[in-house]
Regions:
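A short, exposed loop/beta-hairpin motif centered on an aromatic-Gly-Thr core
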Residues: 15-28
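Short aromatic-glycine-(Arg/Gly/Cys) micro-motifs in beta-strand/loop hairpins
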Residues: 1-18
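Short, mixed-charge low-complexity intrinsically disordered segments
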Residues: 36-64
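Generic structural motif
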Residues: 9-13, 27, 50-55
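Compositionally biased, low-structure terminal segments
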Residues: 5-8, 24, 59
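Compositionally biased, low-complexity intrinsically disordered regions
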Residues: 3, 28, 45-48
């Protein structure tokens, strides 16, 4: 399990967009998710980091 952080570019936002976090099974899945978002013509997304996490950490993050 990995946690990945990405930046969504929005021209109307003061800082040019916002940072968000999502989860995936593997690094490749995280990269594919971001690539799919960009291919769908949504707001541009830049992958910032991918961090391996334990199932327990995922559960803590997801619940809170």
């Amino acid at each position: 399990m990995v946690k990945f952080t990405f930046f969504v570019h929005c021209k109307g936002w003061k800082d040019g967009g916002y940072e968000n976090t999502h989860y995936a099974e593997t690094n490749q899945d995280a990269e594919r998710i971001v690539a799919n978002w960009n291919a769908e013509g949504r707001l541009p997304v830049t992958l910032l980091s991918i961090t391996p996490i334990s199932n327990a950490e995922f559960a803590r993050d997801y619940i809170y």
